[in-house]
Design a protein with these regions (language model features):
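N-terminal alpha-helical scaffold/docking segments in eukaryotic complex subunits
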Residues: 1-82
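Aromatic-residue detector
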Residues: 8-17, 95-96, 101, 108, ...
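Structural detector for internal amphipathic alpha-helices that build alpha-solenoid repeat scaffolds
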Residues: 34-43, 52-57, 69-89, 107-121, ...
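Amphipathic alpha-helical scaffolding segments comprising HEAT/armadillo-like alpha-solenoid repeats
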Residues: 62-69, 89-102, 122-134, 153-158
Length: 158
């Protein structure tokens, strides 16, 4: 599959998911819908495949901002299985952390924080863990604090 097809596939699964969400829940914000609602999306395996192909074939530094936001949103919506977050290469994980810093997506921050121990640079992992510890979302903060402890990050005791 060529890069153009991979990019189109990511965009298609993103827009298809939004259409489904709108049909099922109207204009409700994700955090107001309730738990595990994304599990009812029958096409989630297609989302996983599109995200996997995208991060494997398109270098993170080459992503357009909109592509990064779409991948971040889909990662957030995969919060029960955490498959997307778990398969991100390091460069993609870091790019999504930066995208989250610029424009957070509900349920994405804690998933990114949980993946920080995979980073090759302990200093970078500490930096991002501290960032997520200060997230306005309480659950993201808690998960980031647990990760900080496992990383033996200096900010953990503050």
């Amino acid at each position: 599959m060529n890069q153009s097809s991979v990019i189109e596939k990511l965009h298609r699964v993103y827009t298809d998911f939004l259409v489904w969400k709108s049909a099922e829940f109207g204009k409700q914000a994700e955090q107001d819908i309730g738990g595990e609602w994304e599990c009812n999306y029958a096409a989630m395996p297609e989302v996983w495949a599109a995200c996997f192909d995208f991060v494997q074939q398109i270098p993170a530094h080459a992503w357009q901002p909109e592509q990064a936001r779409q991948l971040l949103y889909l990662t957030a919506r995969d919060n029960e299985s955490e498959y997307i977050a778990g398969m991100l290469p390091e460069s993609a994980l870091l790019r999504l952390c930066e995208t989250y810093r610029q424009q957070p997506a509900y349920d994405a921050g804690w998933q990114l924080a949980v993946q920080l121990p995979r980073l090759s640079s302990q200093a970078v992992a500490w930096q991002w863990a501290e960032f997520f510890c200060n997230d306005p979302d309480e659950y993201t903060c808690r998960r980031a604090l647990m990760v900080s402890g496992s990383l033996h990050a200096p900010h953990t005791e503050r």
